[in-house]
Every structure is written in C-alpha cells, then in structure tokens.
C-alpha cells in the first residue's frame, strides 16, 4: 500500500487543479451552479482516468479491481491534499453499491462504468413532504401498465436533482399491503416526460437541494431493482451505505482530522492556542476523530465486527455528523464577533467558511436518519432498552 500511497501523492502534486477562480461548494449538497458542476465533473473524470475512482470495483463493469484497502489509501491522500470532492456522490456511495449487490447483469453493464466516470449523474428519491424520518409512509406510487410503470408523486431534499440522469427511487407498488411491504425500488430515468425538478434554497443561500415532481412519468419495467415489494429491504441496505459514508467521502475539503487541524490553526492565528480550555476542547475533538476512524477501520474488516454489524454504520453516522457540527460551532465561537460576518465580507475570517460549515452541518444530522432516531435505534436494537412511546 505504501507504493500506492506514493504514486497517488505524486499524481496529486502534478494534477491538483488548484483554485478555479470562483467559489466552490463545500459538498455535493451545495452544487447549484453549472460552472461549479462542470468543473467538479471534469475533476472526477480525471481521477477516474487515472484509476483512482472505483479502485476496488470489479474490472468487468468499469472498476479497477485493486486489492482491498486501496480506495481508502487513495481517499486519504485526496483528503490530505484537500483535493476537490467527487461530485457524483449518490452514485458512488449508494446507487453503485446497490446495483452491484442487487442489480441484474444488464444493470451492472449499463450503469457502473458511466457512474464511475461521471458520464451519468445520480440522485436519490426517498424523502417526501411528510415522509422523511417515517420513510415507510411514502405516498409516491408506481402503477404497472404492461411493460412499464407509471410514477406519480413528490420527492424532496434531492441532492443533484437538477443535474441527475438517474434516480434511485422508492415508490409504492401495492397500496393494499402494510406500509413496509408495498414499496418497490427503481433505477428511474430523470430525463423523461412527466419529471419536473424545482430548486430548494437553503439558509446559506445555496440551492443544491431540489424537489422532484413525478406526474404520470412512464419508465420501462426493467427499471425495477430486485423484486416488486422488496423496496423496504433495499432501502434499508441503502441507508446502511449512506450512514457508513457519512464518515467521509473521497476528496473534498479534507477529512475530519484535517478539519480538527484547521481549527487548531485558527486558534493559533487568534492567539488562543495557549488557552487551557481551548486546548482541552481541541484534544477532545482529536480523541473523538480517532474513535471515528477506528470504527471505520472495524467496519471495513469483517473479522473485527461484532455480532451486531448494523450498529457500526449507525454509530459512524451519528458520531461523525455531530462531531462536524460541534467542531464548526467551536470554530465560530473562537472567531467571536467575526462569526457574524458572511462570505464576501472583507473582514470575515477565512471568508466565513466556518459559518458556512456550521449551517450546512445540520443537513448531516438529519439526512439518512436524524440523530434522535439513530439514538433510539441503537438504544432499542443494540442495547435492549425499552421502546420510546
């Protein structure tokens, strides 16, 4: 692995794109500008062409078939260099793994190579107005009509929806069944009649989320992933991928340990690095990050996982997203009055990136299961505590 690490580090030094000359989003959740999107798409394609996206994915479908652990080394070096994130996050973290696990041979050959190279963009169609935490109450319907399904419904919080070619979509195929049993999972095309994508502007002023209206949109029957009625099982598997992915994605503004180092550097800049309270807080963040990374290592090594493997992704999602929020809040606390300034203000420290991080962090503690719900699940299913009423 050290040879690979040296190779990747040398490649990044030669190919790091640097400053594009315009504001980049902090994550795919904020991509709402065509210039940002195309720049990030080009970066992912360059990484793929170098063999650094899909490093461990099967060669026969467009991956590179490297040994286990190779992608982790690549991702670490990208994070260390603060390289741009990979924009096709829904494809890499959820859609692709689900297709590899549950898709037909035709699905794998049709989708995998294109999603790795960012030739086709994916979004996720799970949450609905009134059906977020209680996802199984979703009301979007898929009605079988010969060799097609007709989709009607409304999805929200759809990251990359305006750019997406495909959507991993949950819809109700059997309205008479109990709510968990009547759901199916689709690899749904977005560029078809009857699909309307509308922006959702966040409190940061960025519009990376979308809502998607499905109005009698017809898609072929082979868009079904798995069996009719298997959607809840597949949705649960997707959420396990999503919660595990919360620990960090390839590239981006640096992994969590780099973020802790950034806050330490901010404390030094502000002359607060000798303050024992500040030092204690920073030490706590570093300890927490060490625990998160240790759990990530356990999750990647089956021999180290307990008899409750589903607990690890839940713990990872809960601890990493709350750590990100608390860390950004502490950085703003260090900045004092300057934390009230925003991007573009000449007096703002680090161009108000910590303020932006703090406001964006709330999405992480909600998406894929709120922190409160995750605590309930861990308490009831892992610790054996009585159910909440």
Task: Describe the role of every protein-language-model region.
Residues 1-89, 110, 114-117, 269, ...:
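Amphipathic, small/basic residue-rich leader segments at the start of a protein or domain
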Residues 69, 73, 94, 232-250, ...:
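Glycine-rich phosphate/cofactor-binding loops in nucleotide/flavin-utilizing enzymes
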Residues 87-106, 132:
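N-terminal glycine-rich flavin-associated loop
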Residues 140-143:
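A structural signal for short hydrophobic beta-strand segments in well-ordered beta-sheet cores
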Residues 148, 152-198:
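A short core secondary-structure module
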